[in-house]
């Protein structure tokens, strides 16, 4: 957790069970902030890292009441409930985007830029070992296990075998 605090994450709330229902309590000033990187922390251990471009309160609502097809929300709802039932506090930390970072005229979404790196470095349990989709070894493994259909793989290898190698990802 200290690594997150050192880069600017702040505690803004926590999860609780009231009459068997999951609820989140957050500092009002962060309810209506967009482009956030957030974390769920149990006993000082980072359990989950996520990002949202939506309002933070709306993102938390989907963990509170996940839809039937929202597998990440369903899993995290269960993890949060399990921790709370074991009397383990689940805190909510956030790294808000102040909107000041730009590359030329383009706004840089800090949450989008940091999420994969933080997950890869910290490897939070509830993230389920997310992998970097740009990892060349994973791309090669996918090619070797025929995850692409034969036609695409043939075209990919045809491009790769010429004098130039093109990244088709």
Roles of regions detected by a PLM:
Residues 1-35, 42-47, 53-169:
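Boundary/linker segments flanking structured domains
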């Amino acid at each position: 957790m200290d690594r997150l605090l050192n880069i600017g994450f702040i505690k803004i709330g926590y999860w609780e069970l009231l009459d068997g229902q999951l609820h989140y309590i957050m500092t009002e000033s962060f309810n209506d902030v967009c482009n956030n990187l957030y974390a769920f922390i149990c006993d000082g251990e980072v359990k989950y890292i996520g990002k949202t471009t939506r309002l933070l309160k709306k993102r938390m609502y989907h963990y509170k009441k996940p839809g039937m097809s929202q597998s990440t929300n369903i899993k995290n709802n269960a993890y949060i409930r399990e921790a709370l039932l074991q009397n383990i506090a689940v805190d909510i930390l956030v790294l808000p985007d102040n909107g000041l970072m730009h590359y030329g005229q383009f706004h840089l979404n800090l949450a989008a830029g940091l999420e994969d790196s933080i997950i890869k470095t910290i490897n939070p349990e509830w993230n389920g070992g997310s992998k970097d989709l740009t990892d060349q070894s994973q791309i090669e493994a996918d090619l070797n296990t025929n995850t692409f259909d034969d036609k695409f793989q043939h075209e990919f290898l045809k491009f790769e075998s010429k004098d130039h190698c093109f990244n088709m990802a």
